[in-house]
Amino acid sequence: MVSKFDTQHLLNSNTALVAGVDEAGRGPLAGPVVVAAVVFDPSQPHINGLNDSKQLSPACRERLYAHIVERALAYKVVMIDSTQIDTLNIYQATMLGMRLAVEGVAHVAKSARIDGNRLPKNLPCPAEALVGGDARDPTIMAASILAKVTRDRHMVELHLQYPHYGFDKHKGYGTPAHLAALAEHGPCLEHRQSFAPVRRMLTPKAIHARQSAHQHNENSPTKAAFNMLIERDD
């Protein structure tokens, strides 16, 4: 671990402390989109085995997750839930998550490198978009692992609440088994109603339940912060 003294020394130096940023869960029909940002000391060797999280086994991701958390100067993981995804759309929800993640490490990071070809607005530091960054940049690889492991763990927890859908297996993606469960049971509160396969199976009961959840979300501290961030884009 880097001590507080060592970290402060790095902050006061000209060392390029770059936050790697990536997301997990843009495509699934259920659950949150998760974004992670992580900052390493560039003078230290890279963690062995880092790769795009999609290319790693679950066991390997879990092992690397522990190493990343131990070695990071700072990291932040943000979850944007299905209600916010439906309110914004998945692209804007992902941009919001990226901005919140970068803000969470801005006390350490001097810049950010974000996987993809677009950057969120109003970031707290200079940033660049890197297409294919999760396969090219070790810090983005680490962020992809933090995001993926966090999301997978969350989907296993959701399986305990909604065992009919098999979230622990497919993690919310539109597999044949998931689509069959949707057809049989209809959507739950964790499904993204703005996604066509879910929208086609909506019932009045499901719509009412989401509206109630949305109303509750409107009064939450997270929603207040969310509104403030959106206003800053205007």
Curated annotation (Swiss-Prot):
Looking up Pfam families in the UniProt record yields: RNase_HII
Q: Which GO terms describe its biological process?
A: DNA replication, removal of RNA primer; mismatch repair
- Cellular localization per UniProt: Cytoplasm
Q: E.C. number, please?
A: 3.1.26.4
State the reactions this protein catalyses.
Answer: Endonucleolytic cleavage to 5'-phosphomonoester
Keyword list (alphabetical) reads:
Cytoplasm, Endonuclease, Hydrolase, Manganese, Metal-binding, Nuclease
Q: State what protein this is by name.
A: Ribonuclease HII
